[in-house]
C-alpha cells in the first residue's frame, strides 16, 4: 500500500528507524522492505520476541522506545514487551486484546500509515 510506504518515509524524515520482522520466508517481504527503504528486514522469524534484544542492540534503543504493529498470535509476546503496540482492524482477537492501539484500517490497506501518524503526532 502506497500510504504505508509513505508512513515509513515520514518516520525516516524525523529519524525514526523502521524494521520489518516477519515469520514469512519470502522474497516478496524482502522486496517490500527494500522498496519502502526499511532500515532492516528480518525474515523467517518464528519467535519474534526473541529478536527484540537483537533489534535493541543493533539500533541502540530500549524496548520501551519501540513501537510495534502486529496482527496475529505470533506477535503477542513482542507486543507485550515494547513501549507501544498496535494491531490492524483485521488482526486476530488475541492480538487486539493485548494491543495499545487498534487501527481502524486493515493490514495492507493503510494500517501502518495510521500507526505511523499516531507515532508522529506524539513527537509534536
What are the language-model segments listed below?
Residues 1, 35, 41-42, 49-124:
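Mg2+-dependent phosphoryl-transfer enzymes with acidic/Ser/Thr/Gly-rich catalytic loops
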Residues 1-47:
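Alpha-helical substrate-recognition element adjacent to the catalytic core
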Amino acid at each position: 500500500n502506497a500510504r504505508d510506504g509513505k508512513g515509513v518515509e515520514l518516520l525516516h524524515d524525523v529519524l525514526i528507524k523502521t524494521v520489518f520482522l516477519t515469520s514469512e520466508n519470502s522474497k516478496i517481504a524482502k522486496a517490500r522492505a527494500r522498496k519502502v527503504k526499511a532500515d532492516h528486514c528480518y525474515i523467517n522469524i518464528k519467535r519474534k520476541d526473541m529478536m527484540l534484544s537483537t533489534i535493541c542492540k543493533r539500533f541502540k534503543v530500549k524496548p520501551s522506545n519501540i513501537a510495534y504493529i502486529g496482527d496475529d498470535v505470533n506477535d503477542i509476546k513482542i507486543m507485550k514487551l515494547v513501549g507501544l503496540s498496535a494491531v490492524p482492524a483485521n488482526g486476530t482477537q488475541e492480538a487486539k486484546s493485548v494491543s495499545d492501539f487498534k487501527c481502524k484500517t486493515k493490514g495492507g490497506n493503510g494500517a501502518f500509515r495510521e500507526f505511523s501518524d499516531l507515532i508522529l503526532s506524539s513527537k509534536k
